[in-house]
């Protein structure tokens, strides 16, 4: 299913915000 814009998942787990 189409999901909202999301940053690529990191190896540690899914992340919904950009790396700071």
Swiss-Prot record:
Annotated spans, Disordered: 1-20
Annotated GO biological process: defense response to bacterium; negative regulation of translation
Keyword Coiled coil: no
Alphabetical UniProt keywords: Antibiotic, Antimicrobial, Disulfide bond, Protein synthesis inhibitor, Seed storage protein, Storage protein
Keyword Disulfide bond in record: yes
Listed GO MF terms: nutrient reservoir activity
Function, as annotated: The small, basic, water-soluble napins are one of the two major kinds of storage proteins synthesized in the seed during its maturation. Inhibits cell-free protein synthesis. Has antibacterial activity against Gram-negative bacterium P.fluorescens, and the Gram-positive bacteria B.subtilis, B.cereus, B.megaterium and M.phei. No antibacterial activity against the Gram-positive bacterium S.aureus or the Gram-negative bacteria E.coli, E.aerogenes and P.aeruginosa.
Protein family: Belongs to the 2S seed storage albumins family.
Complex formation: The mature protein consists of a small and a large chain linked by disulfide bonds.
Name of the protein: Antibacterial napin
